[in-house]
């Protein structure tokens, strides 16, 4: 699975490291980028299961970011899907959204994936939706699953960090909300962010909007880059991986 952050701007006023929008005239180019990236990764031995078209598409301040409302993503998936199929990559899933349960409190973006599924052509190419837990509640997935139970749901990002270092509480709450909460609502899998960071919370982008206080699932000591400390997300993932069988 991979998520993308890009900054291809729509006009001069959007010429920024953050919050630009993708020109419709660049849809073919962006789709070709996906094709070439997947081909290179597979050549290196990585089997790409799924992609999202933009990480946190409603986040104007991410590092780096591109604003991609559902209206834009609805049109781009109609270009990306055929491009992947033409390149023999039709088995790579395309997941919509990849953002928070509360749609970043943007009223016009509520039901983001459902709005895209309502378009017959977009529906054909969209395999499911991806979700983060930085805002809103996992119960948002109830409607998403009930309305389109045939479409996949993946949880694709949550972080731990300095803002709440309580190991026990994070361990229990995250397993309850992220793993059990999504899987019982049709979830197909969980990805946590990041897998590993060092004891200085890096590496991270120096640009505004990057997380400089996040922990990895594992912390590696920067003095030797050998000694590791297992954090709550490591134990969450280890437990789920031990008891959930592939294909379940």
Role assignments for model-derived ranges:
Residues 49-51, 129, 190:
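Hydrophobic residues within beta-strands of alpha/beta enzymes
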Residues 99-127, 138, 147, 163-171:
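Substrate-binding cleft/loops of secretory-pathway carbohydrate-active enzymes
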Residues 152-244:
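Aromatic/acidic polysaccharide-binding cleft in carbohydrate-active enzymes
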